[in-house]
């Protein structure tokens, strides 16, 4: 089933996108900082969410991992 129609898969994809963008921005900030608007601005926004809300994102990742490993 597609990640769009399965809510848990959609949350997993969003969390992975946020974590990946934050990691890429920590390695090469200029790569994401030049595209703050438009379609590619989504990646910059995900990186900002990952940086500013990192404790909450980390808790969500742990909860999602627990859910995937032990609940399903």
From Swiss-Prot:
Disulfide bonds: none annotated. It is a single-pass type I membrane protein. Its main location: Golgi. Glycans are attached at residue 35. Residues 27-53 are extracellular. It comes from the Eukaryota. Residues 1-26 form the signal peptide. Residues 72 are cytoplasmic. Keywords: Glycoprotein, Golgi apparatus, Membrane, Signal, Transmembrane, Transmembrane helix. Belongs to the KISH family. This is Protein kish-A. It comes from Gallus gallus.
């Amino acid at each position: 089933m597609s990640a769009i129609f399965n809510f848990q898969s959609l949350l997993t994809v969003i969390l992975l996108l946020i974590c990946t963008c934050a990691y890429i921005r920590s390695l090469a900030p200029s790569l994401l900082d030049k595209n703050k608007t438009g379609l590619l601005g989504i990646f910059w926004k995900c990186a900002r969410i990952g940086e500013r809300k990192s404790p909450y994102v980390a808790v969500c990742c742990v909860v999602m991992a627990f859910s995937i490993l032990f609940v399903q």
